[in-house]
Amino acid sequence: MSIKNKMKDFFGLEEDPNSTYEEEEYAVANAAAPSTTETSVVRQDDRPKSANNLVALNTKKKDRSKVVLAEPRVFAEAQDISDHLKENRAVIVNLQRMSKEQSRQVVNFLSGVVYALEGSMTSIGHNTILCTPNNVELTGSISNLISEDELHSKGW
């Protein structure tokens, strides 16, 4: 068998001798039947076959990424933030409404959560941090153009 014939067999381009026999048998059966059945067979064959072969490409609903904004006032709210991280959501945490000691505890707690989830934690402003799980890639940086002393003098 030549390569050309093998390729035809592989792609199904070569006619099978058995298929011509079936077609001849079908044609003989249709010739013997009354003309009303012949027209019904023709009508069935005239239907568009693409309707049966439709496949929806968007069958799976895409999971959208979410970013949660959190502004905890007490340390106990840090557990809610960690739950969001465990559910693969990025969290922006504003610590301005907490005392310095409590905000330090929240940062320590969240750094442990982020480490356990193999995520990352980045400061994005004065008393504001971004915690991301491992499925979120963070690119770029925010430079601190204003020193913290200037922020405190302006009341920020």
From Swiss-Prot:
The name this protein carries in UniProt is: Cell division protein SepF
One GO term (biological process): FtsZ-dependent cytokinesis
Upper taxonomic classification of the species? Bacteria, Bacillati, Bacillota, Bacilli, Bacillales
Does the entry feature the keyword rRNA-binding, yes or no? no
Record family assignment: Belongs to the SepF family.
The UniProt keyword set, sorted, is: Cell cycle, Cell division, Cytoplasm, Septation
Subcellular location per UniProt equals: Cytoplasm
- Gene3D superfamilies reported in the protein's UniProt record: SepF-like protein
